[in-house]
Regions:
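Bacterial Sec-dependent N-terminal signal peptides
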Residues: 1-8, 180-182
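An ectodomain-focused feature that recognizes extracytoplasmic/extracellular
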Residues: 5-72
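Residue-level detector of beta-strand face positions
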Residues: 41, 81-83, 125-127
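Internal interaction segment
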Residues: 88-182
Length: 182
């Protein structure tokens, strides 16, 4: 066993040898269990001291992209668009699936084609068209790597029913309990 395998604690050749950081809680979204990746902080280029968070999530077999702009009164309407600019010069436009909100939330369920486009191409910037102002988000090379890694992780991740997780954990605890007696 190599040092890398020992550190990762994984001897299966077909598994990824890195921690994806995927979190699944007991909460449900639209009555379905979901999992999410760690948020990636993106700098807003055209507004000082403003950041946005990019996060991916999964419900059933569907992958979602969420962006929240951390600024006051950022109203984004349902079906308002977001443009992703790739380093190749190509631009992809997504419509907001989330209801009208003034908390700066943009959500998009990624189709297989959308997923592949975002995963296989380096993003240079993202532009969100809010009600009163447009926000331009810069995406670095390191953030592109994180995006690719998180999409790979989510694609392979199976969302569990939280009850199944509890049962497995409970069975594991029972095995580890010492036998009672003197």
């Amino acid at each position: 066993m190599t040092a890398q395998e020992q550190m990762a604690g994984n001897t299966d050749e077909n598994s990824a040898n890195f921690d994806c950081g995927i979190v699944q809680t007991k909460q449900k979204l639209h009555n379905q269990y979901f999992a999410s990746t760690p948020a990636i902080s993106l700098r807003v280029d055209n507004v000082e001291y403003v950041y946005a968070t990019l996060q991916f999530g999964k419900r059933k077999d569907k992958i979602f992209m969420y962006i929240q702009i951390a600024d006051k009164n950022v109203c984004i309407e349902k079906d308002k668009v977001l443009d992703i600019f790739f380093k190749s010069g190509e631009v992809v436009t997504f419509k907001n699936d989330f209801a009208l909100n003034c908390e700066g939330y943009f959500a998009k369920q990624l189709s297989k084609k959308d997923y592949l486009k975002v995963k296989e191409n380096e993003i240079s910037s993202i532009k969100i068209y809010a009600y009163e102002k447009n926000y331009e988000l810069y995406v670095s090379e390191a953030q592109n790597y994180d995006i690719d890694n998180q999409l790979n992780c989510l694609a392979a991740y199976k969302v569990k029913k939280t009850d199944e997780v509890k049962i497995k954990k409970h069975k594991k605890e029972e095995k580890n309990e010492p036998a009672s007696g003197t």
